[in-house]
From Swiss-Prot:
Gene it is expressed from: lspA
Pfam families in the cross-refs: Peptidase_A8
Membrane-spanning segments: 55-75, 85-105, 124-144
One GO term describing the cellular component: plasma membrane
Matching InterPro entries: Peptidase_A8
Name of this protein: Lipoprotein signal peptidase
Membrane association type: Multi-pass membrane protein
Keyword terms: Aspartyl protease, Cell membrane, Hydrolase, Membrane, Protease, Transmembrane, Transmembrane helix
Length: 152
């Protein structure tokens, strides 16, 4: 299925980008891309977003495995008839596995995309995080559109 190819693409880009950061940047260093907006910053995270649940790797292992099984089941059941859902789940699956690989092999997640939004220093993130968020946003949009159609 094409949706698994999307997941594999996300995993590949995520892992290659993280490898490049680890091999070429010292931890904590930053390269400005757009001053005061976008930086490439070598950062490590031993928790989830904003560092919550730091050093709780077993929790993340269990949750991720359960989550991945659920996503694969859901993809097999519903993605055949719903392309947007399939794309969304492919992005989510790739993102979940990308960060899982880091947790298993590094005991931390490599983050490097550093954004300032209206002077707010947003937590550093990575390609897997982006894919997860985009997938979730697409599902929310689809749900809202379906709700609107049902009302008509």
């Amino acid at each position: 299925m094409i949706y698994y190819v999307i997941a594999l693409f996300v995993i590949a880009i995520d892992q290659i980008s993280k490898w490049l950061i680890v091999k070429n940047m010292e931890l904590g260093t930053s390269i400005p891309i757009i001053d005061n907006v976008l930086y490439i910053t070598s950062h490590r995270n031993r928790g989830a977003a904003w560092g919550i649940l730091e050093n709780k790797m077993w929790f993340f292992y269990i949750i991720t495995v359960v989550f991945v099984v659920f996503i694969v089941f859901y993809m097999k059941k519903y993605a055949k008839t719903d392309k947007l859902l399939g794309i969304s789940l492919g992005l989510i699956l790739g993102g979940a596995i990308g960060n899982f690989i880091d947790r298993v092999f590094r005991q931390e997640v490599v983050d490097f995309i550093h954004v300032y939004i209206f002077s707010y220093n947003y937590p550093v993130f990575n390609i897997a995080d982006s894919a997860l968020c985009i997938g979730v946003v697409l599902i929310i949009i689809q749900t809202l559109l379906e709700g609107k159609k049902a009302k008509e």
